[in-house]
């Protein structure tokens, strides 16, 4: 029975934690600021931002993204594009745009991964702050102002991660991910910000203090997710990371099951690589929020394997002809299903209410409230089974390269 309690109440406890954290964050920090007014900033005192765009085979999206960044009204900006040895015509497109626009183009001839590309770019950055964007990102006009404002009040702030929104919503899979980002992922980042440590910045859209990135030794070229890896390096050096929901961008997500699976396995593998690398270093720190983040990841992995072992044990020892046993098992199943569904409805309703401030039409996603978070846990469990062994086999000292998943339809 203790095993069952753990299997059921771990996801329930985490959902409640995210709900409470999101509500508190919203009423104490988020609701006080207007979406229609950017922070009051004196242009003469405005900090400059270098925008870094690393791209590999992004010919379908790089023109839109680069045009967007060039059109941003942020008064002090520098743009550096790094082509990471693309095998398509990405470089040709960038050279063509450069004929009529002012930006720095670093054209690497060999594909050595996003981390290496960012490292090459930041070394040429003139300003003290660098904005890292993916090649499919469309940045909201006011986002840089909201993000840079955070650094005024916290000298130990190393990075501010923004609020990514989904551009492609034409398919069912696109719509589901829209709701996922609006509810589950938004809840998690709000709660973690309150707890004092965000597990990871969003690689698609984050503003870094350049000196902090240099201090931690830049991005790791041998880690499959450079964003998670640099987040923990910042944590361990005493820097803080904040989530800024008012700073929005628009990105593309996979619209095929294969593309989504590939993306989630990479994310999970990257998290596990960081866990294996940084566990002992984390235990030596005196930052309690980092202990919470680390043990949350460990418990998530253990939860998956305990579920499998427990289900296997039940299957082997079950007497399917025993009416009492079957009745009891079915009752437990109904209880757990009702509990999870009830919590899911509350979590989705709260999250989408908060998120409706940014996209009111996302409230239509309430149709998914009863089942998607449960599916989310099941998908994550399957991903862990594949990703954790990959993390154990990580080759240190090389270059971690990967291709972007399918980007779907670009319609907003």
UniProtKB/Swiss-Prot annotation:
Phenotype of gene-disrupted mutants: Deletion of the icaADBCR genes leads to the inability to form biofilms, produce PIA or mediate N-acetylglucosaminyltransferase activity in vitro.
Enzyme class: transferase
InterPro entries associated with the record: Glyco_trans_2-like, Nucleotide-diphossugar_trans, PGA_PgaC/IcaA
Main location: membrane
GO CC annotations on file: plasma membrane
Alphabetic keyword roster: Cell membrane, Glycosyltransferase, Membrane, Transferase, Transmembrane, Transmembrane helix
Molecular function terms, GO-annotated: acetylglucosaminyltransferase activity
SUPFAM superfamilies (alphabetical): Nucleotide-diphospho-sugar transferases (SSF53448)
Membrane topology label: Multi-pass membrane protein
Membrane-spanning parts: 6-26, 298-318, 332-352, 366-386
Domain of life according to the entry: Bacteria
Enzyme Commission identifier(s): 2.4.1.-
Any single GO BP term: cell adhesion involved in biofilm formation
Compartment(s): Cell membrane
Function: N-acetylglucosaminyltransferase that catalyzes the polymerization of single monomer units of UDP-N-acetylglucosamine to produce the linear homomer poly-beta-1,6-N-acetyl-D-glucosamine (PNAG, also referred to as PIA), a biofilm adhesin polysaccharide. Requires IcaD for full activity.
Family: Belongs to the glycosyltransferase 2 family.
Name of the featured protein: Poly-beta-1,6-N-acetyl-D-glucosamine synthase
Originating gene: icaA
């Amino acid at each position: 029975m203790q095993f069952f309690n753990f299997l059921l109440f771990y996801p329930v406890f985490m959902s409640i934690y995210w709900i409470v954290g999101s509500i508190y964050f919203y009423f104490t920090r988020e609701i006080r600021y207007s979406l229609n007014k950017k922070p009051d900033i004196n242009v003469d005192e405005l900090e400059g931002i270098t925008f870094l765009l690393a791209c590999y085979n992004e010919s379908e999206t790089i023109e839109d993204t680069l045009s967007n960044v060039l059109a941003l009204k942020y008064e002090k900006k520098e743009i550096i594009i790094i082509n990471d040895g693309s095998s398509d015509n990405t470089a040709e497109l960038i050279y063509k745009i450069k004929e009529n626009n002012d930006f720095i183009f670093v054209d690497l001839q060999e594909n050595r991964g996003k981390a290496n590309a960012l490292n090459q770019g930041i070394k040429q950055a003139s300003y003290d702050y660098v904005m890292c964007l993916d090649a499919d990102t469309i940045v909201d006009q006011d986002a840089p102002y909201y993000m840079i404002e955070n650094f005024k009040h916290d000298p130990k702030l190393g990075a501010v991660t923004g609020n990514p929104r989904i551009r492609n919503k034409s398919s069912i899979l696109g719509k589901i991910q829209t709701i996922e980002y609006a509810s589950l992922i938004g809840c998690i980042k709000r709660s973690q910000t309150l707890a004092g440590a965000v597990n990871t910045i969003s690689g698609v859209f984050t503003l870094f203090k350049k000196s902090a990135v240099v201090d931690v030794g830049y991005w790791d070229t041998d880690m499959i997710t450079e964003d998670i890896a640099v987040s923990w390096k910042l944590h361990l050096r005493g820097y803080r990371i904040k989530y800024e929901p008012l700073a929005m961008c628009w990105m593309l997500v996979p619209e095929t099951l294969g593309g989504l699976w590939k993306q989630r396995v990479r994310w999970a593998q990257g998290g596990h690589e960081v866990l294996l690398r940084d566990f002992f270093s984390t235990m030596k720190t005196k930052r309690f929020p980092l202990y919470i983040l680390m043990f949350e990841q460990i418990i998530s992995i253990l939860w998956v394997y305990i579920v499998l072992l427990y289900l296997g044990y039940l299957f082997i020892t079950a007497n399917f002809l025993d009416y009492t046993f079957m009745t009891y098992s079915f009752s437990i199943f109904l209880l757990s299903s009702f509990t999870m569904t009830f919590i899911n409805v509350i979590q989705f309703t709260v999250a989408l209410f908060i998120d409706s401030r940014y996209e009111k039409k996302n409230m239509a996603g309430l149709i998914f409230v009863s089942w998607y978070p449960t599916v989310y846990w099941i998908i994550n469990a399957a991903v862990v089974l594949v990703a954790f062994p990959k993390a154990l086999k990580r080759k240190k000292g090389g270059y971690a390269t990967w291709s972007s998943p399918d980007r779907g339809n670009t319609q907003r």
